[in-house]
A protein has these predicted regions:
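Cytoplasmic helix-loop-helix junction between adjacent transmembrane helices
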Residues: 93-129
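Hydrophobic core of transmembrane alpha-helices in multi-pass small-molecule transporters
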Residues: 3, 73, 83-101, 214, ...
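C-terminal ends and interior cores of transmembrane alpha-helices
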Residues: 68-81, 286-299
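Helix-loop boundary and gating motifs at the non-cytosolic
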Residues: 1-39, 207-212, 217-237
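Juxtamembrane intracellular "pre-TM" segments in multi-pass secondary transporters
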Residues: 177-210
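Helix-to-loop junctions at the C-terminal end of transmembrane segments
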Residues: 44-58, 145, 263-276, 364
Length: 418
């Protein structure tokens, strides 16, 4: 299940930008809008589907329904070449895909509970197969040709994703049943959607943290949207036309996912040694390097910089998401802890990704390559400097006990706002 769950996403998330820009000649702002759809969906769809799974439809069945609908819209999207209908179909597909990340986790947890297995111990090795699936799908669309053209450069990547969606939709109905609580105590929509946790903005430190979560969240989708397209642009230069990096750019970009998986193992040590604030600062500086190396790199003598950009991605993404989630865990009361985690995700993967994707597209249209990468790097550096000055936090190593387990649990989070 986890393999298919993320293979569906890996089939198009990294390569769609190159198809939109190179195959359909969309502008940077238009390309950014496609990746902003994930921000729109993250604002409310996971919560709505979570309510439905809790109250009315078992999670495994709802998982199948969502994947079927998402796959249907992917097929519709694949047949479109004009911006408006293609965007509309992708938005609707993403609206039904994003909730499946949380639903698949719930289904997995339920299956482990039924088998009387410890979720902390047994779930991470299962979830790793999601990353394997994501990378495998990236390699497939990069290495497979239809009509002499790589799938990653055509609408066929959406057909591949749709096929995988239908396979998982069918398989979901065979998974162990998840309970529903039809007689659960009624709550207001404010409580059900976790909106009461927004009261945390009244606390200065939490408000500062959430604002910076949004500011850094703006960086999450930039390389997903434009990384492959940028590398493909080198193919128009005679000296790089036959470069393996250009021809297999998605395989190069898959190093980012490999780095992400490995960097998770470093987080417990860094959190205990340096504390949350410094770890978050390391993440922000890693984003500076991520973008800067992209700007310096090229498929020739600068290939090493492109590889370094992939390697630092794991630090940039993991160190912020997991340390940020831990900060929320420590600073909030048990009654609103889950809702507060939801606010953190909304600020990063919702508002941050939405505004960041559109802003990045506008920058690309205005300044082109490689200047845009240096602008993104400068933005990340400014955010890091201001965060270091404004955010007040005193590290207490004793509070970091149990971090190892927490970091492993967060492998299950929707990490591809990568």
């Amino acid at each position: 299940m986890n393999f298919l769950q993320y293979a569906i996403w890996g089939s198009w998330l990294i390569s769609l930008g190159a198809y939109l820009g190179g195959g359909l000649d969309f502008s940077g702002l238009q390309i950014g809008s496609f990746f902003a759809t994930m921000g729109i969906a993250s604002l409310f769809m996971p919560a709505v589907m979570g309510i439905i799974a809790d109250r009315w439809i078992p999670a495994q069945k709802l998982l199948g329904i969502c994947h079927f609908i998402s796959g249907a819209f992917l097929i519709a999207a694949a047949s479109q070449t004009a911006y408006a209908p293609l965007y509309s179909c992708m938005l609707l597909s993403v609206m039904f895909y994003m909730p499946t990340i949380a639903l698949s986790n719930s289904v997995a947890y339920n299956a482990l509970d039924l088998a009387r297995l410890d979720t902390v111990k047994h779930f991470p090795p299962i979830r790793v197969w999601g990353t394997v699936g994501f990378i495998a799908a990236m390699w497939f669309v990069d290495l497979t040709h239809i009509g002499g053209v790589q799938i990653k450069l055509t609408e066929w990547q959406l057909y591949v994703s749709a096929l995988l969606s239908f396979v998982l939709a069918d398989y979901s109905f065979s998974l162990p049943g998840c309970p529903v609580e039809r007689s659960a105590q009624k709550q207001s929509w404010v409580d059900t959607l976790g909106l009461r946790a927004f009261a945390l903005f009244k606390e200065k430190r939490m408000a500062i943290f959430f604002v910076f979560s949004m500011l850094l969240g703006a960086a999450l989708q930039i390389t997903n949207a434009f990384g492959d397209s940028y590398i493909q642009n080198f193919g128009s230069m005679p000296q790089y036309a036959d470069s393996a990096i250009v021809k297999h750019s998605v395989i190069l970009l898959s190093l980012s996912q490999m780095s992400e998986t490995l960097c998770i193992l470093l987080i417990p040590f860094f959190l205990r040694r340096f504390g949350i604030k410094k770890v978050m600062l390391i993440s922000m500086l890693a984003w500076v390097l991520r973008f800067g190396f992209f700007g310096i790199g090229d498929p020739g003598s600068g290939a090493a910089f492109l590889v370094l950009s992939m390697i630092v991605y794991g630090v940039a993404f993991d160190f912020f998401n997991i340390s940020g989630s831990l900060f929320v865990e420590k600073e909030t009361s048990r009654e609103i802890r889950s809702s507060a985690q939801g606010v953190f995700m909304i600020m990063t993967n919702g508002f941050g990704a939405f505004f960041g994707s559109y802003a990045a597209g506008a920058v690309v249209d205005a300044y082109g390559w490689p200047d845009s990468w240096f602008i993104f790097a400068g933005y990340a550096l400014v955010v890091a400097v201001v965060f270091a000055v404004v955010f007040k936090y005193r590290h207490n190593p004793a509070e970091m006990e149990g971090v190892k387990h927490l970091s492993l649990i967060h492998i299950s989070e929707p990490t591809r706002l990568q």
